[in-house]
Every structure is written in structure tokens, then in C-alpha cells.
Amino acid sequence: MKEGVNLLYESVVVNLGARCNASCEHCCFSCSPTKKEALDKNEVINLVENFSNNPKIKTISFTGGEIFLNYPFLYSLLKIVNSSGKISTLISNGFWGREIETVKKYFLDMNRMGVTNLSISHDDFHSKFIKTDYIRNILIESRKYPDIQITVNIAVSKNSTGDKIIHDLGEAILGIPVTKFPLIPVGEAKNINDDEFQNIYSLSHPNQLKCPGFEPVYHFNGNVYPCCSPAIFDTALILNDELYQDFDKT
């Protein structure tokens, strides 16, 4: 494999499960409190150990569902990654920002375990379940940990712009990278009215469709997808022919 191609795949994503404490109407994975679909925990541990010992991989990312709902298990995975000298990144809805002491503990743990990026998903859809005050608490505490890059990801539609979210975060959002991205009709978002989608991407302009990630995603449904775009999950583009396939075969 050419060196340039090797560099594309220095990270891998593990989607641990569909369980979430929110039931957002735009969720690309249709996650909710009642969903039980998840990767087998022992197999996840084996996968993460395999990833951590693979010299090609530099970064292992964890997402869901909501990964902080089973914090002891998440912490055990972070320990595996950190013990191998690799780094972790996390995606969360930030529900744990409710209690200041919990926020302090989690940041101490993340800092010790080599977490370099924490992405918080919060927008008009998430805020129906997770108070924006909780996100503010996380952003304020994050200033004590400059080695952990915080970003806020805001899904938007024509009438749900996320502007009120940014306003309500106040000074806590200052200096924090914010990404606004348009909804696409996958998962639960298929049920949203068509006129809510901006449709800013077009197959007639392929230069707009460049993927910035190139991260294989080990999904809770057992498939391995070639990237993390929500659009990929409604296609036949999968990379595995067996469950819990090792990274080199992928």
C-alpha cells in the first residue's frame, strides 16, 4: 500500500451501541433509551486491544448512542488505548454536564487517559432532552484542560438553525470551535419534511463531496463502514465480511 494511502487510515471509530438518553427526531442512527442494539463488550475489548497494538493506528474514537451512559466500560476502553500510547477522541451529547462534580471527574479522567478531542453534539434537536446549561458547564470546565480540544457540533435545518443555542451558551462558547452541518434525510431525519433540508451538496459538483475523514467505522449493527458520514449507512458500502473483523483485513 502506498504511503499516502496509509496516512488516510491512521484512525478508527467504534460505535458502541444504539442506547441513548435522548430520542432526537434527526438522529441518523435512530438511537433512543429503549434501543438495545450494541457490540458485544468482550468483542469490543478485543477490537480495541487489536487497534491499540496496531502500529498503523494513531487514534481511536468512541461514539454511540451515548457512550457516557456506561462510564465504567468507556473508562476501561480509554485505559487500554492509553496504555498503548495511542490517543482517544469522544463524541457525546453532554448530558453529564448536569452535575459540576461529575464534569470535574470526567475531565480529570479524560486528561489522564490521553483523550485529545471531545465533540459535543448539541442543537435545537438535542436541547429538547439535554439542557443547554449542561453544555455550558462542560465548556467552562474545559478551559482548565488545554490539551483536550472541545468542539460543539450543531445539526441545522432551515428552521432549526442553532442560533439560539449559541446565544444561550453565552461567554462559555467563546474560543470554542463550532461546526454547523446540514441535516440529511437518513435515520429518523427521513421523517422530517423535505423542505427543511438545505441540500447544499450535489452530485453535479463532485468536488464538493470530498470526504475529510477516511475513518473506518465499526458500527453497532456489526458492519464496518468506510467513513463516518451519516449518508453511508443507507448504502451497501461496507468493508467487512465477518463480525469484529480486524483492522488490517478491513
Where are each of the predicted segments found?
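Short loop/turn segments at strand-loop or loop-helix junctions that form parts
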Residues: 16, 121-123, 228-229
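Conserved alpha-helical substructure of the radical SAM core
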Residues: 1-93, 97-105, 112, 117
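Conserved AdoMet/S-adenosylmethionine-binding subsite of the radical SAM
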Residues: 69-213
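Accessory C-terminal segments flanking Radical SAM cores
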Residues: 182-250
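Short coil/turn linker and secondary-structure boundary residues
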Residues: 39, 98, 130, 242-245
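Solvent-exposed, well-ordered amphipathic alpha-helical segments
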Residues: 5-10, 49-55, 136, 140-143, ...
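Short, well-ordered beta-to-alpha junction loops that form the rim of enzyme active sites
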Residues: 65, 155, 229-230
